[in-house]
Structure formats: C-alpha cells, structure tokens
Amino acid sequence: MSQSDVVSQTFRALVESADRKFGRVRDLPLHGNRSQNHHSFHKVFKAYMRLWKYQQENRTKLVESGLNRWEIGEIASRIGQLYFNQYMRTSEARFIVEAYVFYEAILSRRYFEGVKVKDLGVRFKELRFYARFLLVSLIFNRTDMLNLLVDRFTHLVDDCKTNFRETNFREWKLVVQEIVRFMKADKAFTNIRPLRYCAMFDSHPTSLPYVARFHAKKVLKFKDAILTSYHRNEVKFAEITLDTYRMMQCLEWEPTGSFYPKRPVVFNDHSGASIDHSGASGVIDMNFAADLTDPTLPPNPRKSVLYRPSVTHLIAVIATICEELPPESIMLIYLSASGKAGISNVSQLENSGGSKKSSNNNVLSRISRKQNSSTPEYHINGTKESSDYYENYLWFGPRGNGGPNNLYPGDIIPFTRRPLFLIIDSDDSHAFKAERGETAALFLSPLRPAFKDQSSADTTQNGSQFTFFLTAPLQAFCQMVGFTSSDSDSDFYSDAEKIISTSFSEWEVILCTSTSLDLVWAQVLSDPFLRRLILRFIFCRCVLSLFCPPEDSEQYLPVCIPHLPVSVSPKSELVQSSVRRLANHLGVAEYFKCLT
C-alpha cells in the first residue's frame, strides 16, 4: 500500500469518526444540560479540528488520491454548523463569529463551485450550505452578505431545477421565498441603528452615575431567556420568526465600532479568474474571527428560541431552565401567540365578517368583558381570587381547537418560585393579569395594534407592533404614523434617535431616584438589557395613549405589573413632552391628541 493510500484511508477514517460524533451532538436538545452539552461539543470540535489539520498537512497527497474541493467545503460547512449550533445553545458571540468565518471562507473559495459537478448529492450539500449561511448572516446582521447570498442561492435553485428535472426542488423554492419575505419585512429603517445593545445609543452619560449608584435591597442578574412565537403564516426564516429574531437581537451586545469588518463583501464573477483553484486549499483565516470579537463586552444572556413548540414542550423547557437558573438570577420569558384558536391577529378578526371597525370593536369588547366580568371570583382566606388563569389562554397549536394546545396563566404559576420577567404579546395578553404566583415582572401587550394606515396592522406581514416598540422604538413609531425611511436622510433620523436617547436618560434618573419604585422593578434595574426594555415600555405606553382613541384606551394600551411610578406614567408631563418633541421633529404631531 502506497503512502498516498495510507493518507487517504486515514483521512476517510477521520471523516467517519468526526461525522459520527457530529450526529450525536446535532441530536442533543438545545436547552438545558449545560455541562453535558459543553463536554459533547468539546469532543466533536476536537475531532473536526484534528481532521481539518490533517487535510491541511497532507493536502497534496489527498488531492493526488482524488480528494474533491467540495469535500473540504463539506468539512468546513460541518465546522460552521457545529459553531452555529453551539451559539444557539449558549448565545456566546464568539461561536456565531466562528460560524460566519467558516461559511464566508467556503463561499469566497468556492469549494462547491470549483468543479462543475452533475452530482445531485453534492448539489444538495451546496443548497444546505447556502441555507445555513443565510441564517448565520441574518442573525449576525450582515445585510450586504445576505443580499449577495439571496442572489446566489436563487440562481443555484434555478440551476438545479434546470439540470435535475426529475427532482422536485419545491422545498428549496420555499426557502428562497421565506428569506425574501423576511428581508422585505425587516428592511425598513435597517440603517438607523442596530437592534443589539449598543453603548453609543443605549448608554446615557448624564444618567450613568445614577445607574452606577443605584442599588436595590436585592439585585438580580439576567442570565437566561426563553423566546417563542406561534402565529399562523407569520414571517420567518428556518425556525426564527420575525418577532423572536428582533428579541434575540435586542438581548445581545453590539461590538464597538472598531470590531466591525472593514472588508467589503465583494467576490469575483463566476469565472473565478483571480481565485486559485489549482489545489484543494483548506486554509481559513482564523485571525478574522478574533478581529470580530469584542473582548471588552460581558457575555450575552443565554437565549432558548423555541419554534412553534407544543405547550408541554414549552413548559418542559421552562422547567429545565428554572432548575438550572443560578441563585440571585432572573429569567425572561417572551411569549407571542394568539389568544384565540386559529386567529393570529386583528386583521384576521376583521375579515371574519362585518365592517372592519365594528367587527374589531365587537370582538375585542367581548374579550375585554370576558376578562373583566364574566369569570367567577373566589375568596380564599379573605383574598379575592379569579379563575381567569384557567379560563383565558394563549394558543400554541395548528388549526383546530383543543385544550392540549392552550397555555393558561395558571401554567406559569409553578415557575414564579424563581424570579421571572414575563413579556406576553397577544390579543388576549390581559388574561395574564390573573397570574397569582409569586410576584413577577409583567409586560402585557395591547389587545390590538394602532396604526395610521390599518394595512400595517397585519402581524403576518410586519410582526408585532408591541415587540417592535420593545426592540426598535423609533422604527416602531415611524411605522405607526406611516413615516418611511425614504422620507428623510440619516442625519434626520440621528436627531430623532438623540431625542429618544435624551428622554430615556431623563427617565433613568427618575427611576433610579424614585422612592415608590416597586422592588420587582428595582431588583432588575441594574441590568442594561432589562432596564432598556423598561424604558422602551414607558415610551410605547405613552405614545399609544396619545395616539389612540380615549374611548378604547384599554384595548390599545400595554400594561405593566406591578405598576411603575406615576412619574413615568402616560399622563406625566415629562414623558409626554418627550413624545411631543419627537412628533414635532418628524412633523406628525397632528396625529397625537394634546400635542398640537
């Protein structure tokens, strides 16, 4: 047996060993068992690094033995997938960076394009590579790369349909449609500012000393979050919906400016004239990953993203994470779902019959009356208890009706033994006012959205308005009043951001110096992510209170439990003046009562 044969056999054995380990890690649940997941990841990562190093050291002999470029691309793709899966388990920024580096190298070196193969299996590998790189670029917020990938992916799918006419590529056409729809929904105002926590926008020098000095009797650390959205036909890509994507981004640190990649996303044309394809190069610039990682930032909170979970699965994940939650820590739970089986938003209620306005008001009034008066109340030890927490619900299921798909407020009670920050985004969110466990921080969305142009109210096209306010308040404000990014330049929006930033700084001082701030809010105020959510809630509530008809205010306004101080209520002159400044700056004060 020649030395080349020995090298080839060793390489194949390393590939098989790494793939077996990869299969075991891929099938592990994404949530819980941190120590086991870390150990398994370390083993499979070590196997692939050994394989990667071996092919680099023996590349010439492997090429002589018939190694194809796409085989190296497949190994690199597996490593990228391994990093991405670990990012989804841990939310550690370095893993998404490493995934991006490997996928970008595969694309720039054209591992799958070096030889014009007619092998259907290789084409499927290339399709999967593009779909995964699209998801990584989306989460990593690389818009230029996304645009490039969509063009190439669309071309590849069309090419596959032409060359493999006997094969059905409908599934891949749907992937193209998903990402195009997602990017269309998320493209407005994308250049204003990042959704992630950015020191440039979210750290306010004026109020920073007050935040630094603030210390509650008990301070909780924000460590874990569960994010899930379940609506019919909602905007999504892969298993990331538009709403969960916005929440994911909102709970991440943005690298400082020096850590942005300065290299433009430009690749040569398909001729590949300037790229050396003479050998199966396996060299990937690992230093680029270090350039994209900001060592000054604290770790991101770990986020568990659940796509269309069953109620039992959701409860099981909550229980698992509660069990592993460190002492003196708080968990955020974000639930976005309809309160009625098979109805995902107000727009669908409108189309069920009758005029839009009367249908909306009648249906939502019935919901409100049911919440406020129809359910019986019980007196236990002199305390009034409502049965609402087993009457109203969120709907986590496909078409049809049935109790197993209902998530009741009472289902959350056992987990309130640990500190919780609950965000309920639903047309039946106010049902969670009946939650009667240990006191949790609660944000409850309005029962219906409010827009100048009601066509924007369709959450299947634009996502939730309440979630948009919590993750991108200026963009949500502009969308509400019909103000598009084409209406003005970047400096104009920068000035609008400064108005909001100044307002948030003032409200931070109020919260940090208030003597009436409930302990539930005080113990999370030191956390930058949760503090930013509180400030944005205050802004959202005041904007909607001034924009919406007063006779239907209960349906249009979000609710927080416990109450925040009166000094930051929608009726506060200081808070209203901030909305007034922003509305005047954008020239939309006429849409707000008491502002003109």
Language-model features, listed with the residues they occupy:
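Cysteine protease catalytic core and zymogen-processing segment of caspase-like enzymes
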Residues: 341-474
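Active-site-proximal C-terminal subdomain of hydrolase catalytic domains
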Residues: 420-545
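TPR repeat positional signature
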Residues: 14, 21, 76, 83, ...
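Short coil/turn linking the two alpha-helices of tandem helical-hairpin repeats
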Residues: 25-30, 80, 85-91, 134, ...
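Flexible helix-coil transition and linker loops at the boundaries of alpha-helical arrays
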Residues: 51-70, 108-121
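N-terminal alpha-helical scaffolding segments that mark the starts
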Residues: 1-50, 56-57
